[in-house]
Structure formats: C-alpha cells, structure tokens
C-alpha cells in the first residue's frame, strides 16, 4: 500500500473582484484636493461621514475607512505599490488627505468601471 503524497496549497482561495492589476497607481496624489473639491470639503468638514462612505464603498463596517488597515486593503486590492509602513505614516501624518485620496480613487475607478 502506497502512501498518498500530501497536497500543498500554494495560493489561498479568496473572495473579491479577482486578481489585482500588477502595475496600478493611485489615480490622484495625496494632496490633489482640487481635483475633486466635493471630496475635499467633505473630508475637511465631515471627516466621519467620508470615512463611512469609504467603508460602505468597500463593503466594510462603518468608520474603518479611516484606518491603516483599510488603506492597506485598498492598496493591495488594486496592486498599488507601497508597504504597510507607508500606509501607517501617511495615515498618521495626514488622515484627512489619505482618506480623501482613497475616496477620489474609488470615484475614478468607478467611472472607469474598474471598482
């Protein structure tokens, strides 16, 4: 009787829109607020509201849109280069700018039908 070779799982199955593009970038820079003034104003005067919008856009719980984890999830989902350390520093130094950047990116990807 021969022993059966063990099955090794190389990639874990996931849930989501499929594989991320390999060479993607942010659609706008962190300080490009004038490219979408509505998002900028919402982020400045109603930061929690914008956080909830981002969380809802990504099918996550309310207010986690402002977190490092959400930025890292978004960045990895769309193949945007960077690291969790970069995400932490950006979110720590300018949470309003990073949240606005994610929302602008979501809006642009929606317009291109890639979100």
Swiss-Prot record:
Organism in which the protein naturally occurs: Pongo abelii (Sumatran orangutan)
GO molecular function: chromatin binding
UniProt similarity note: Belongs to the cornifelin family.
Name of the molecule in the record: Placenta-specific gene 8 protein
One Gene Ontology term from the biological process aspect of the record: positive regulation of cold-induced thermogenesis
Gene name of this polypeptide: PLAC8
Superkingdom of source: Eukaryota
């Amino acid at each position: 009787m021969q022993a059966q070779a063990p099955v090794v799982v190389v990639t874990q199955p996931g849930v989501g829109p499929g594989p991320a593009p390999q060479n993607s970038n942010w659609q706008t820079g962190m300080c490009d607020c004038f490219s979408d003034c509505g998002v900028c104003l919402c982020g400045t005067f109603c930061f929690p509201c914008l956080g909830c919008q981002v969380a809802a856009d990504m099918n996550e719980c309310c207010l986690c849109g402002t977190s490092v984890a959400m930025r890292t999830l978004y960045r990895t989902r769309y193949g945007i280069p960077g690291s969790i350390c970069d995400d932490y520093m950006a979110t720590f130094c300018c949470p309003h700018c990073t949240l606005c950047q994610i929302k602008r990116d979501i809006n642009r990807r929606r317009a291109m039908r890639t979100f």
